[in-house]
């Protein structure tokens, strides 16, 4: 699933491609991608101009004229690409926004898990899943105190806690494994047993790794591509994720992999301490 750095990369690459364009027509080849009223989606978007593209956590917020916003969640494999309106359709293209200049933005999703909603701008927290999210890394609200206090109430393991979007918005499996290895915290550590000073270190590393990943335009492990069809660059910097059986760069112990609530989790059994 695209995590915060990947969605931010999509946002940054989409802006120069579609900002300022006016929608002429919308085609829904797979209507279930749109979670709100399909007919309204088709009838209200023609004539609307792309004003800007924002993001919160893993959600893209495509700002339109007349105070409307398309909220888009890519889920597992959603992608956007710009083409011409007469270009052959790929079998995994499910939504098309045709612009007045003859170009078209297509949403492609192999698994069909992605979702879009058409809402009034400013109602994101009231009408979408954004309202259930915690603060995202590198925001002014995501302080070390916020994370320390948040973990005090969590008795589950730290891996699941960091994947909980109501605690930290935007993190996924890849970056959680990397952060826990950097901070030498075992993924099965009980969240509220981790010392405050260690949680502060965790906070700093979350911010750091997200910054690094955004700078390198995200991580492509399976299928992630930005809006220009390019892969990310952070996969070459991964130290633990995808390296099961290889030696830890710090101690030489072979990385091990376990399942934590169904999620593959790679860690160093020597460096990473279990807090219980």
UniProtKB/Swiss-Prot annotation:
UniProt KW DNA-binding keyword: yes
Single biological process term from Gene Ontology: base-excision repair
PANTHER family, per the entry: FORMAMIDOPYRIMIDINE-DNA GLYCOSYLASE
Cofactor annotation: Zn(2+)
Cofactor note: Binds 1 zinc ion per subunit.
Active site, renumbered: 2 (schiff-base intermediate with dna), 3 (proton donor), 58 (proton donor), 263 (proton donor)
Entry EC number(s): 3.2.2.23, 4.2.99.18
Assembly: Monomer.
Protein name, per record: Formamidopyrimidine-DNA glycosylase
Catalytic activity: Hydrolysis of DNA containing ring-opened 7-methylguanine residues, releasing 2,6-diamino-4-hydroxy-5-(N-methyl)formamidopyrimidine; 2'-deoxyribonucleotide-(2'-deoxyribose 5'-phosphate)-2'-deoxyribonucleotide-DNA = a 3'-end 2'-deoxyribonucleotide-(2,3-dehydro-2,3-deoxyribose 5'-phosphate)-DNA + a 5'-end 5'-phospho-2'-deoxyribonucleoside-DNA + H(+)
UniProt keyword Membrane, yes or no: no
Binding-site list for DNA: 92, 111, 154
Annotated GO MF terms: 8-oxo-7,8-dihydroguanine DNA N-glycosylase activity; class I DNA-(apurinic or apyrimidinic site) endonuclease activity; damaged DNA binding; zinc ion binding
ZnF (FPG-type) residues: 239-273
């Amino acid at each position: 699933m695209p995590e915060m750095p990947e969605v931010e990369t999509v946002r940054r690459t989409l802006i120069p491609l579609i900002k300022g364009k006016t929608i002429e027509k919308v085609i829904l080849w797979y209507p279930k991608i749109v979670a709100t009223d399909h007919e309204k989606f088709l009838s209200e978007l023609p004539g609307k101009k792309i004003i800007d593209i924002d993001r919160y956590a893993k959600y893209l917020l495509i700002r339109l004229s007349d105070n409307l916003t398309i909220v888009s969640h890519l889920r597992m494999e959603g992608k956007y690409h710009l083409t011409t309106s007469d270009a052959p359709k790929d079998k995994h293209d499910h939504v098309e926004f045709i612009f007045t200049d003859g170009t078209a933005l297509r949403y492609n999703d192999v698994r069909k898990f992605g979702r879009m909603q058409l809402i009034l701008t400013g109602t994101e927290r009231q009408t979408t899943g954004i309202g259930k999210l915690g603060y995202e890394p590198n925001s002014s609200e995501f302080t070390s105190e916020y994370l320390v206090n948040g973990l005090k109430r969590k008795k589950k393991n730290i891996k699941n806690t960091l994947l909980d979007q109501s605690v930290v918005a935007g993190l996924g499996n890849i970056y959680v494994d990397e952060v826990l290895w950097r901070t030498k915290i075992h993924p099965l550590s009980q969240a509220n047993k981790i010392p405050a000073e260690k949680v502060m270190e965790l906070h700093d590393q979350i911010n750091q790794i997200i910054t690094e990943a955004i700078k390198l335009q995200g991580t492509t492990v399976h299928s992630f591509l930005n809006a220009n069809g390019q892969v990310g660059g952070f996969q070459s910097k991964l130290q633990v994720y995808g390296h099961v059986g290889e030696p830890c760069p710090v101690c030489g112990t072979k990385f091990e992999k376990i399942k934590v609530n169904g999620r593959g989790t790679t860690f160093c059994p020597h460096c990473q301490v279990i807090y219980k």
